[in-house]
Amino acid sequence: MAALTGVRFRTESTPATDSTSDLNMVGNLANNTSVTSVVVDDGTDFTAGQNIKMNSEEMHISSISSNTLTVVRAVNGTSVGTHNDNVSIFEDTSPTYSPSRNPDMNVDFNTDYKGITVTQAYGGKIYTNERYGKQLAWELRYTNLISADRDILEALWNAVKGRKTSFYFSPDSGTTFYNVRFKEEELTFTQTAYNIYSTTIGLIQEVS
């Protein structure tokens, strides 16, 4: 399980929205993880912290300077590749659904095998049945959320209709994403000061 270093939420498994900006480099973007500067048509089409995809390679944007993106190559289980000039760049929805601040550091996360049931027959023999395997879970506690961040979490809650639809959560700044659902049936905020809120969010991994 990835340690919590930076939380991102998105509604799609991979960047799928056409950014309308293409790669704008002489030659190509080399097949090398040490090549981390990506020049695009318009840097304002992107946000630091979000993930992008060129061909089948997913990248994480660390920072933006004008039309140059500084990225981490080959994240979320993808492989580094060569990308020709003018290739389309796709972006994820994480800027829409990720608060500007991370949760407090007292984050609970666990691994369980609750999908395995155990029964014991007469005579003492034990039988097991695996309905599903390992499942990860997180509990994120936010304090000092500004109104805009509260609205972002409410937008995510409404986009997936509470517990109805799964979405994607990264605990490590977009390097790894997990398919998850909300654990609770309602999203509750407590106003602790003027325009300041707190909430706790439980997430459980979607397993097959």
Predicted segments — roles?
Residues 1-20, 76, 82, 88-208:
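Extracellular/virion structural assembly segments
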Residues 3-5, 9-93:
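Autoprocessing Asn-cyclization modules and mimics
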